[in-house]
Amino acid sequence: MNKIKSMLSVYFIAGSQDCRHLPGSPVENLLNILQQALEAGITCFQFREKGERSLAQNPQLKHRLALQCQQLCRQFNVPFIINDDIGLALAIRADGIHVGQKDTAVERILSRADYRPIIGLSINTLEQAQANKERLGIDYFGIGPIFATQSKADHAPAVGMEFIRQIHELGIDKPCVAIGGIHEDNTAEIRRLGANGVAVISAITRSNDIARTVQNLACHS
């Protein structure tokens, strides 16, 4: 469990769709940002190629980009997680898979895998947390969105920082990473309330100084 908690400290999530605000190729921009983030010290990367203007409709390009991101993560010994796409994750033997409440069932992932991937589950209500706190196969919770966010078009309602404290008051000790509207200025309070880490998209993809941003996200861990 301690290994999972450490992994969650500075958890970067991105796909090429998150890099279209920059000039040039979104794919090359993602790889460049990921390289800088890895050099700066992120502890986990989730490949989330999903939504409008992503490569979701082009499986070959998505597969190629996933392999490139995985290769970078391996160079830095950082876990490489894939969002929801179980076929891709198992085909390239990703370190882990992250799923939402409406995505692929955890039991299906475990039955199909010939190795034990790390599995994360998104949580947005206390009822979901209670129902899954002792469920076999789930290694950590992604809780949120803590604040409203524009990085995900289909996000659930924001739950607020107190949600983190409420989870711990219920005696739920599953490792958890907070996501949604998180930036350098609110990281300390989120960790103080009990989150093992912070997950960010735009805080890094839109940063003017990725090294400084990652350092600030990690400084209270």
UniProtKB/Swiss-Prot annotation:
Binding, 2-[(2R,5Z)-2-carboxy-4-methylthiazol-5(2H)-ylidene]ethyl phosphate: 149-151, 181, 201-202
EC number assigned by the record: 2.5.1.3
Keyword annotations from UniProtKB, A to Z: Magnesium, Metal-binding, Thiamine biosynthesis, Transferase
InterPro entries reported in the protein's UniProt record: Aldolase_TIM, ThiamineP_synth_sf, ThiamineP_synth_TenI, TMP_synthase
Annotated residues for binding of 4-amino-2-methyl-5-(diphosphooxymethyl)pyrimidine: 46-50, 83, 122, 152
GO molecular function ontology, one term from the record: thiamine-phosphate diphosphorylase activity
Coiled coil: none
One GO term of the biological process aspect: thiamine diphosphate biosynthetic process
GO cellular component: cytoplasm
Catalytic activity: 2-[(2R,5Z)-2-carboxy-4-methylthiazol-5(2H)-ylidene]ethyl phosphate + 4-amino-2-methyl-5-(diphosphooxymethyl)pyrimidine + 2 H(+) = thiamine phosphate + CO2 + diphosphate; 2-(2-carboxy-4-methylthiazol-5-yl)ethyl phosphate + 4-amino-2-methyl-5-(diphosphooxymethyl)pyrimidine + 2 H(+) = thiamine phosphate + CO2 + diphosphate; 4-methyl-5-(2-phosphooxyethyl)-thiazole + 4-amino-2-methyl-5-(diphosphooxymethyl)pyrimidine + H(+) = thiamine phosphate + diphosphate
Pathway membership, UniProt: Cofactor biosynthesis; thiamine diphosphate biosynthesis; thiamine phosphate from 4-amino-2-methyl-5-diphosphomethylpyrimidine and 4-methyl-5-(2-phosphoethyl)-thiazole: step 1/1
Cofactor: Mg(2+)
Signal sequence interval, chain numbering: none
Superkingdom of source: Bacteria
Cofactor binding notes: Binds 1 Mg(2+) ion per subunit.
Function: Condenses 4-methyl-5-(beta-hydroxyethyl)thiazole monophosphate (THZ-P) and 2-methyl-4-amino-5-hydroxymethyl pyrimidine pyrophosphate (HMP-PP) to form thiamine monophosphate (TMP).
Family annotation (PANTHER family): THIAMINE-PHOSPHATE PYROPHOSPHORYLASE (PTHR20857), THIAMINE-PHOSPHATE SYNTHASE (PTHR20857:SF15)
Name this polypeptide is given: Thiamine-phosphate synthase
Natural source organism: Actinobacillus succinogenes (strain ATCC 55618 / DSM 22257 / CCUG 43843 / 130Z)
